[in-house]
Amino acid sequence: MKNNWILPNTGFERVTATISGMQKVSRLLSVNYRTSYTWRQSDNLPALGYSSNSISYFLIFQNPNVNLDWYRPMWKKGEENVTQLQPFSKLIGNPYVTLYESLNPTEKHATISMISANLKLSNHFDFMVRSALQMEIDMREQHRPMSDVIYPKGYFKKQNIFNYELNSDILLTYHNSFLDGVTLNAAVGGNMMTSKLDMLSNAANGLITPGVYKLANAISAIEFNQKILNKRVNSVYFTANLAYKNKLFLDISGRNDWSSTLPERNNSFFYSSVSASVLFNEWFNMPREINLLKLRASWAQVGNDTDPYKTSRYYETTNFAGSVKLPTTLFNADFKPEISTNYEVGMDIRTFGNRLNVDFAYYYNRTKNQILDAPMDPTTGYSKATINSGTVQNMGFEVALNFIPVITNDFRWTSRVNWSKNKNKILSLSKSADENQLISKIGGASIIGRVGGTIGDIWGYKLKRTTDGQVIVDASGLPVTTDEIEYVGCAYPGWKAGWYNEFKYKNFTLGILLDGQHGGKIYSTTNAKLGIQGKSKATLNGRLPGTPLYISGDDSRLAQAGLLPMGGTYIIAPGVVANSDGSYTPNTKPVTAQVYYGEYYKVENVETNLFDASFLKIREVRLEYVFTKRQLRKTPLSSASIALYGRNLFCFTDYPVFDPETGALNGGNIVPGVEAGSLPTTRSMGVSLNVSF
């Protein structure tokens, strides 16, 4: 696979190969194996987000009336590879230098291998041993030329990441039928998981010779950093499935893990599950229109550990070989494993010859002792602390509707609708946590958890208003923001839905998938920067004749009245001014559009950069033709099909930037409800050919 992305000189290549097989060693012993290998390479993966080396950052600050060809050539004459042309601002790099010189090459090799042996001990017992190895080698580089905004003397970084995970299992299974229609399938086993991450980085902060990206070209001592994470989890588990005449089913499971990443006194944790289902149509006489009526209920627990080295003080290596520094995250020698408990009840009903099927589920989930690194006051000497954060609840509904409206000899229309609604709530926080627990912060928006709220609550400064909702304006004619941050909305939507329609006529199949969500909020730093610079459509008000808020400075009557100087365009911000007696009067103070929008859309003002995240997408359209056996009879093919497809074709939303289905990256975590320097979601179209021999 070769992918050329929407930006010049970016993209990647990928090659995947898989081999699998089974060997019957004897009548009782068989061996299965499977190996897959993936190679992925890119000469340049683009930098994204709100950073000076991303094209989105350049486009935010670039003047819209500037011809990009003015940035050619990239370098000042006589100072090639040393001084890039930055004709309009030193804060943004030359876009051609960003795309063709500030490179991020990468090459990755990944393998997943599995081998298992199955031994039939008797008619009722089987024994299996299995081992699976997942291994990755990732080689990355960063090239930054001289006169880079962040690295004026150039920069080169070489990073090698080795990662593997080895899982070894033993499993004894039992299966039998007894009494009258009772079947039992049971198993008991053990697993040992070992993983290692070894990340080695070397960097040259400053280059002797321009354009030569080698560690030997470092202008000073090479910055060295190595991170090694080792982890082991030992487990024992059991499962049992009991069925009575295919009418009544009972499933039970249990597992105990011992994790090396947890404190010694808490490193063992047990979790289990129980589920039952009953087919009422097999027990009772139902109307002939009902083909199946199934009720189910389940209770399940899932345990979870964390990353290594959070239980004691471990010194961190610095950029210089042989030196260490104090950790920035406060360790915890007494935290507990995370446990999630889930309850679910559901119903599956199929009617009219399976032409109308409904599946409904209600679930309730409670997670306690979530392990996270919570921000803390830097004056303590630490920026974060490892804690058990408290208890979080999720509850909701899921509904799936499948129906066939039309069916004839040559034509079939199948429709599937999915709808889900989830409500998140924080029930308690750690005793050591503040009343408002900061989860993440990007731009002016803070994701804050508090009891009674959600883990997606967005907080920030808002416009200060009167009790009847009018915006308060100060004496200079600019809107006033609140003194403290306040709750502005939740990132999570009210509900999500999808609708798939498939139209099949003879050998042709047309599939159309729509999906979307209703509700949720998203804060955009891109909108803030565009608004401050007058590059969004919303800032045309007050700048063009005929638009709201527009006041012409050429109106001599206003000038003679001393309200504003001659020339230019002005805005009188809608709102009221507070009087000394506590009353309010309408604002009459004109300000320039540049000053007004610079204050109104500032990054810290979360309310004015917050939007509804509802959307509807045409997720996929696919037209496929399947060749008949008769058409293939003179070929070596057993089956063949060809399809035209398009993915992410359209998005209907009121969100003014690109795609509301996004999040911002903060320290390796995706923060919902926040956008920072994103690029447009790509639309893809292609042809797919599938053949079998």
Segments from the language model and where they lie:
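A short, flexible beta-alpha/helix-coil linker loop
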Residues: K2-N4, R255-S260
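Surface-exposed loop/interface segments of Gram-negative outer-membrane beta-barrel transport/assembly proteins
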Residues: I6-T10, S20-A110, R130-N234, T261-P263, ...
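Alpha-helical scaffolds flanking conserved acidic
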Residues: F12-R14, L292-L293, S638-A643
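Transmembrane beta-barrel architecture of outer membranes
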Residues: F12-T18, S235, F269-S273, S684
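Residues on the lipid-exposed face of transmembrane beta-strands in outer-membrane beta-barrel proteins
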Residues: I19-Q23, I115-L119, S168-Y174, V188, ...
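Short glycine/threonine-rich loop-to-helix capping motif typified by GTGT followed
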Residues: E264-S268
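Conserved C-terminal beta-signal and adjacent last beta-strands/turns
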Residues: T414, C490-H518, N605-F652, E675-F693
